[in-house]
């Protein structure tokens, strides 16, 4: 408790400040400004035993509400008072006065306080404040700082429109009365009516936004808990009681808001559900701290016990249930960021605009997913007569449509790149306004389109057949040659283009065949494929050279006991040359009745142009000493070189 000397010094300071204010304002005209500053100095005196006089508060409120400029003068005066003092009593009384003006004063005052703080006034920014008037200053200094932080948060809520109601001291105590004055812009006795909607009338999004600010403000209120010697101080208790009254209303608003959110929790958007769950988790911890704060306030005798609300704690089971529900719903694909409501699990009514099919149709080896096609509502509509006419005018053919098409068929890709959508009867609009005449026109247009599509298919098949016939293969030309005297030149050739020169240059087989025909001259040998119209074509390989392995003519080798080699329709006489050596077999040797294996001669399956003439039926020409006759080979090469340029020019032209 301060000594009498300190009380006297404080009284002298207060009187000196009042005299200086009167002199300074009297020189500039005085009037309401002098009265306002004197009332502020008297309300924030150094006397700890004297609380703020309600009559002075009412006078200050009346002056502020009479003129807008007076609100700025009041904020400047309070800023000078707090900035110059090092006494916790003066600082705390100044803060309580600010709170009273916030509750019952002109709405322009909070804005002027903010402007004054931006200009450097230390009204609510008391982070550097320190008490020098007490032997135990930290308890009181901490309370002043936390009280200033609460007012700063309250100012933020009010300026952003998040504060639910303006808490008027007249409605709570009813002790404030004022003399009737004509200068006031509103009647103080009537109070200030709030035009903001009640909590029960707010939408979930607005409610979640405001609950977040209310919880921050409630945290600041809980932080004003006094410690040490400040618990027993009367001025501290009176200041804390004003904060307690606002915390009662904050708790009720938060509880009512959370109850409304939980009632509509399963019908909210997904992000709103997450915000509501976070608010519930924060409220469960905050309500425990608030209950402890109220118990402390009751123990030190702040207010009446009947004024305190009953704190309803949020159960842990409820939080676990909400958390499990959010985990389950997080697995669902969010459509446009919306949370799927329980109604989304029910089958939607059949409609052409709202039908969303997420099934997959299996057509053979390919699977067509129709979920993407029907993901956007209203994107699927039936084909109308106007659409078909517009497509016909544009020159695009419509796909063939059938009443037997698969229901809800997906998109079908044409080999030419056209994307066709299969239309079914289930895709027709379920709208009674559609007349029967429109449906008949649609059916007629569908028939026309189907006929046109069928005609185009027939033309495509003809073109494909023609293209197959036009393709020229030298091997096919050789195999289809059933007449030995028929020449390949009889095959009609299309006029070749520059792009086909390289392809035509590869027809070397024609040149080889022509050369072989010229070399033969008068030979009666002819190359005939096996298995053609002639059942037994002539196969002769007569040569003038001596062959030591052929002692008899080929025709005489075909005896009844010798094996016959048959391939296709051609019968060849197998022969075995005499061996150059013999094995002496004992007389008592008896051969087995049946051999273990039997070797058969093989003939070439294909005519390889790179092999010798023997593969085509020619026999090699051997010399008398068993070597190849070089003269005949050189003769063939000369004939080839003579006709090479002529053949190449003929086929490249």
UniProtKB/Swiss-Prot annotation:
Residue ranges annotated as motif ALPHAC-AD binding: 608-610
Subunit structure: Interacts with ALPHAC-AD and clathrin.
One Gene Ontology cellular component annotation held by this UniProt entry: Golgi apparatus
Subcellular location: Membrane, Clathrin-coated pit; Golgi apparatus; Cytoplasmic vesicle, Clathrin-coated vesicle
Domain of life assignment: Eukaryota
InterPro entries xrefs: ANTH_dom, ANTH_dom_sf, ANTH_N_plant, AP180-like, ENTH, ENTH_VHS
Region (Disordered) location: 170-190, 338-360, 390-432
PANTHER family from the UniProt entry: CLATHRIN ASSEMBLY PROTEIN (PTHR22951), CLATHRIN COAT ASSEMBLY PROTEIN AP180 (PTHR22951:SF75)
A Pfam family the protein falls into: ANTH
Keyword Transcription: no
Gene3D superfamilies per UniProt: 1.25.40.90, ANTH domain
GO BP terms: clathrin coat assembly; clathrin-dependent endocytosis; protein transport
UniProt protein name: Clathrin coat assembly protein AP180
Location of the ENTH domain: 28-165
Gene that this sequence comes from: AP180
GO molecular function: 1-phosphatidylinositol binding; clathrin binding
PROSITE patterns: ENTH (PS50942)
Ranges of compositional bias, category Polar residues: 174-185, 416-432
Motif (Required to promote clathrin assembly): 442-444
Keywords associated with the record: Coated pit, Cytoplasmic vesicle, Endocytosis, Golgi apparatus, Membrane, Protein transport, Transport
Main location (coarse class): membrane
Functional note: Adaptins are components of the adapter complexes which link clathrin to receptors in coated vesicles. Clathrin-associated protein complexes are believed to interact with the cytoplasmic tails of membrane proteins, leading to their selection and concentration. Binding of AP180 to clathrin triskelia promotes their assembly into 70-90 nm coats cages.
SS bonds (residue pairs): none
Coiled-coil boundaries: none
